[in-house]
Amino acid sequence: MNDMDGHEEKTVGEVFSIGKDNPPIPGCTVSKAFGGDKGIIFFSLAKHTDISAEIYPYHKLLIVAEGSVEVYGKDGFSQVLHAGESILTPTDVPVGMQTTEGSVYTEVRVEKESRMNEIIKAGEVFKLEDLVPYGEGKVVNMDVVHNDKMKLVVMAFDEGTGLSEHAAPGEAIIFALDGEAVIGYEGKDQVIRAGENFHFAKGGLHSVKATKKFKMALLLTLE
């Protein structure tokens, strides 16, 4: 078992922080895959580092956890993302990343044939938490992107609502976006707050109970 696998096992069933658990190494760019070959990677970029612009035949969805990162390309294309912001990069044109202060972000590979919600436009900065509204006494759900290897969903829970115990068909990460909730996992309750993450193992029984208004993104790997 390599160190990466060991870290994934440590975070299973626990509240953790992608940003705090992957601090940048001075002068370096570091990448760490999640869930094997599902196209989900945690990146840590030290200040004044960059990933050279290259052409990719697929989109990249970035979810920034810490710091800020500039996504840049040809013809003056440039978008700066801060913690809590996301972008879907364009395809078939050079795209690179650079940072002056350092950044930690999650990158999700999104194939062209993936089913994407029409609200998402390539090259535009957005916040996942802004995609869905709260509804009184309701749980509001939006599929953001879906392909054979992963699915990203954003959910808004009114205070007191939740999801009863169920199991995920693959490994999954929760991104807490707003508010607070209690995650029940294999009989243990844990509080999760905005800015934190939670790691479900495949088949792990879990539930969600919003103790306050709560928004989260669920990134699910599929077998």
Residue ranges, per PLM feature:
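Ligand-binding loop in jelly-roll beta-barrel domains
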Residues: 91-115, 202-223
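Short acidic-glycine-tyrosine-enriched beta hairpin
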Residues: 75-92, 186-203
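Conserved small-residue-rich
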Residues: 119-180, 186-187
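A short, N-terminal "cap"/entry segment at the start of jelly-roll beta-barrel domains
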Residues: 1-39, 82-83, 102-104, 109-149
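Glycine- and acidic-residue-biased ligand/ion/polar-headgroup-sensing regions
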Residues: 58-74, 169-186
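A cytosolic small-molecule/anion-sensing beta-strand core signal
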Residues: 65-66, 82, 101, 177-178, ...
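Conserved short histidine dyad/triad with adjacent acidic residue
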Residues: 23-29, 36-56, 137-141, 151-168, ...
